[in-house]
């Protein structure tokens, strides 16, 4: 799945029973003032927040991911525009990629240049095309 500036509501969180490991690429702007990255009255936060488990952590646990690394998202050689958290070594070879974009609000990024931090359609396709319903594609 590939949510962009979306969070998981309490009802979904309480009733979700995924039978498959789920590859997830999530992109969210830190400046989003519509669906706050830290959650809100109807939505869970994306990351752990006190005693409330975050959405990414929820899926990391379902997918049984064992490795994590974080890297800077660069625009050009000298400008960091956010961070990319990558959870890997997960069940069925799936991954979770969490793009946290510093100067982005609640808008769709598409060009990858100028005011658009990343080309979201390309990021989504490059990620999801690596998987099937059963997990990671086997390279031939």
Regions found by a protein language model. Give the residues of each.
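Flexible, surface-exposed loop/gating regions in the mature catalytic domains
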Residues: 1-140
